[in-house]
């Protein structure tokens, strides 16, 4: 006589990220938007986060993990800290500012 060992069935589907979380903007849109280089794209990602039901938890967790960069909880993070806005890559444009030597 042999006894087959089987896992008990509960009738409940396994939890996935999609079933645990509501349709949050970062899970239904373009994920690259939250890690864009363009400051305008990052501002758009921040705006999409504004009505997110898990915004506060997202930001708290990102700060605890010291996320290196991206938009988390409606804020831009750079090296684990919140920054007001991301500067574009490259050197800032030189401003002549009325300096005749710069012309």
Curated annotation (Swiss-Prot):
Compartments it resides in: Cytoplasm
GO cellular component, one term: cytoplasm
Record region (Disordered): 82-103
Membrane-spanning residues: none
Maturation and modification: The Fe-S cluster can be nitrosylated by nitric oxide (NO).
Record's keyword terms, sorted: 4Fe-4S, Antibiotic resistance, Cytoplasm, Disulfide bond, DNA-binding, Iron, Iron-sulfur, Metal-binding, Transcription, Transcription regulation
Main localization (coarse): cytoplasm
Cofactor(s) of this protein: [4Fe-4S] cluster
Disruption phenotype: Not essential. Cells have a 5-X decrease in mycothiol reduced form (MSH)/ mycothiol oxidized disulfide form (MSSM), an indicator of a more oxidzed cytoplasm.
Domain spans labelled 4Fe-4S Wbl-type: 25-82
Domain of life: Bacteria
GO biological process, one term: cell redox homeostasis
Residues where [4Fe-4S] cluster binds: 17, 49, 52, 58
A GO term, aspect molecular function: 4 iron, 4 sulfur cluster binding
Cited Pfam families: Whib (PF02467)
Induction (free text): By a considerable number of antibiotics many of which perturb respiration, redox balance, or transmembrane ion flux, including erythromycin. Much stronger induction by erythromycin plus the reducing agent DTT but not erythromycin plus the oxidizing agent diamide. Positively regulates its own expression.
Cofactor binding note: Binds 1 [4Fe-4S] cluster per subunit. Following nitrosylation of the [4Fe-4S] cluster binds 1 [4Fe-8(NO)] cluster per subunit.
General function of this protein: Acts as a transcriptional regulator. Probably redox-responsive. The apo- but not holo-form probably binds DNA. Participates in maintaining a reduced cytoplasmic (MSH/MSSM) environment under normal growth conditions and directly or indirectly controls the concentration of mycothiol (MSH + MSSM).
The family this protein is said to belong to: Belongs to the WhiB family.
Protein name: Transcriptional regulator WhiB7
Organism annotation: Mycolicibacterium smegmatis (strain ATCC 700084 / mc(2)155)
């Amino acid at each position: 006589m042999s006894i087959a060992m089987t896992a008990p069935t509960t009738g409940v589907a396994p939890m996935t990220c999609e079933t645990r979380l509501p349709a949050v903007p970062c899970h239904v849109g373009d994920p690259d938007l939250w890690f864009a280089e363009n400051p305008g794209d990052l501002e758009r990602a921040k705006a999409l986060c504004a009505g997110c039901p898990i915004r506060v938890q997202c930001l708290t967790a990102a700060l605890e993990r010291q996320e290196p960069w991206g938009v988390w909880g409606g804020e831009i993070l750079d090296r684990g800290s919140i920054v007001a806005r991301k500067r574009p890559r490259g050197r800032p444009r030189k401003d002549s500012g009325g300096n005749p030597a710069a012309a």
